[in-house]
Regions:
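The feature marks helicase ATPase cores and/or their adjacent C-terminal helical subdomains
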Residues: 1-347
């Protein structure tokens, strides 16, 4: 069976690649991390077929982990109530790997960041693999770069299934982790070469060539990302668009008021009362034309110094995500120009 991981760039057609492989006969399991990308995939599938075919199953990751990997095999025995996104206490008692109390609260809610390990520890992985092989012909994973901690280890185990496996992602769009648990895979995303080696070790073929050009971003935006943010990306198009920093207060207010131009903030976009999103949360969103990226002071200083590539990796990756949402013009605005609109408390 084919086992492939495709390393792509923003806007290169990751979603299209998945959807083009679908038909109305082959049974396909699709897993992605964020709800936004789940919704985007669902929309694209319906656009292709006019409806959502019954032979295709689409999950967000933690729904897949709990309802597909855990419930059929362990729920009746363990009598758990669901999944909690609260973390286990660092100050509480330490339980061993074979102690159920390590994986759930006193009220029997499963810790999300240890659920994949629980599936492994209970020797359930082989059952999950058998279930995938029984019900599906192919297993596709989108946003693979966000799998971390025990979740990444589980994913590497599941790719041993005797079905086609295709994982798609962009290493530099790693802005969130599915979960973290102590030092488990803590340096997974610290080195691109070592990251790729993990997939090779799982006997997956690496595709580094088929999705290297963005179909979304103009040459101007791609050149800016490559030269200033330090992440290589090319454009399928020779189109030129504006990439600029606004330093005029009145112009910034016009951008703020515009219902057609999304404002992307590092965080707390909801406090500004405009058409907006956060940098990282804009990942998977493909419907913006012109984009306004709001720069906090450290990012503004780096922009002016030509040093955006030196931002800490998490911030740099989120900035890359934000900039690569633009199909048209890419405008930067200092957040100082928009502070007057920020609510002290979200309503």
């Amino acid at each position: 069976m084919d086992k492939t991981v495709i390393f792509a760039v923003a806007g290169s057609g990751k979603t299209y690649r998945i959807v083009e492989r679908l038909d109305e006969v082959r049974r396909v399991l699709i897993v992605t991390y964020t709800e936004a990308n789940r919704d985007n995939l669902r929309t694209r599938i319906i656009q292709k077929f006019g409806y959502f075919p019954a032979n295709i199953v689409l999950y967000t990751y933690f729904t897949f982990l709990h309802s597909f990997c855990y419930r059929p095999f362990l729920l009746s025995e363990k009598r758990t109530k669901g999944v909690t996104y609260a973390r286990s206490s660092e100050k509480g008692p330490k339980f061993g790997l074979d102690d159920d109390r390590r994986y759930m609260t006193k009220g029997r809610w499963l810790y999300h960041h240890r659920l994949a390990k629980y599936v492994e520890q209970t020797d359930t992985v082989k059952d999950v693999i058998a279930r995938i092989e029984k019900y599906f012909d192919a297993f596709f994973v989108d946003e693979v770069q966000d799998f971390a901690g025990h979740d990444f280890n589980l994913l590497m185990a599941l790719c041993r299934s005797e079905v086609e496996c295709m994982f798609v992602g962009d290493f530099f769009q790693h802005t969130y982790d599915t979960s973290r648990d102590g030092a488990v895979n803590i340096n997974l995303h610290a080195d691109y070469e070592k990251y790729k080696a993990r997939f090779k070790a799982a006997k997956m073929e690496l595709d580094l060539a088929s999705l290297i050009k963005s179909r979304r971003c103009s040459k101007s935006v791609c050149d800016f990302i490559t030269e200033q943010i330090g992440i290589r990306i090319e454009s399928h198009s020779d189109a030129l668009t504006d990439v600029r920093l606004v330093e005029d207060h009145a112009v910034a207010q016009d951008l703020y008021q515009s219902p057609k131009i999304v404002k992307l903030f590092l965080q707390e976009h909801y406090k500004y009362g405009c058409y907006s999103q956060n940098w990282g949360a804009s990942k998977g969103l493909d419907h913006y034309e012109d984009v306004c990226v709001v720069l906090h002071p450290a990012a503004l200083d780096a922009w002016k110094a030509g040093a955006l590539a030196t931002l800490n990796p998490e911030t740099r990756n989120k900035l890359y995500v934000a900039c690569s949402r633009a199909r048209g013009n890419l405008t930067f605005v200092p957040d100082a120009f928009l502070k007057q609109h920020k609510r002290k408390q979200a309503k």
